[in-house]
């Protein structure tokens, strides 16, 4: 969800570039109409370049905004109350923005939701008099103090390039609440089929219960259990299916499945920050023998290149055991559990319930 006072289409184009369906609200009459299956909503408070006659430009239009666009202000105030905002490149000179901030403060007093504003720190320009610089500096300090009255915390930066770093850190933290579960099995050795299926259901349920989102490709021998465990917990917690789990079964009967499946895996993983790997075996179509899942190796490589935190449960064997070995030899803790956690995940004497506790402990640690 984005709010903007700009008329251009930069936000919409950026969303389109990552295959997101965008619902644009640029007029009060748009607010009551929801676009089917949209991934993001963009509120354009001052209108859109496609409707130049309806944009907010003049002083008279600004002064009448509270009457002509009251529905926009009400929606903005609702979001300020229920969501955390990050303000970027927005001028707080906008009288309508001040109106909403004051109204939210009047409603909630000291209990306002905290928001954030990124602002470049004033610096002395070449040739600028010291007294002029000190005046601008003091002016900024007073502005920052004033924003605190509206529960807006200012983040000072020295250069605009720092914004990208901040947004990347926010995205990474957000994605670490979304877990990709990679698993497939036609054969079970270290643990029985019944134990594995029950474990997968419990894992999915625990993830939902602890407010993680799940993405899964409905792997052979795993898809039903991922869906069942998650669906039961979603129902118990009165959550919505769409916001908590995304099941993406691989399309079949394609002329070039390898290329299509690669793109499919990329799409699944790009919206996650953690990848859990379980078992990973299949029957070879030529020899009819059980082999490791090459698709799981591809998912591991894609997850690693995306920067996901990788959790291979080596004790479940097969391809996951290979991935566990690869990860132990990499010695890179930036994307991996600790050495003790990895050794625990490879312990075949432990029950799957114990491995589940280890996984959830890791997730809690990296999200704290």
Regions found by a protein language model. Give the residues of each.
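SIR2/sirtuin NAD+-dependent deacylase catalytic core
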Residues: 1-178, 185-192, 209, 232, ...
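Acidic/glycine-enriched connector segments
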Residues: 187-192, 196-367
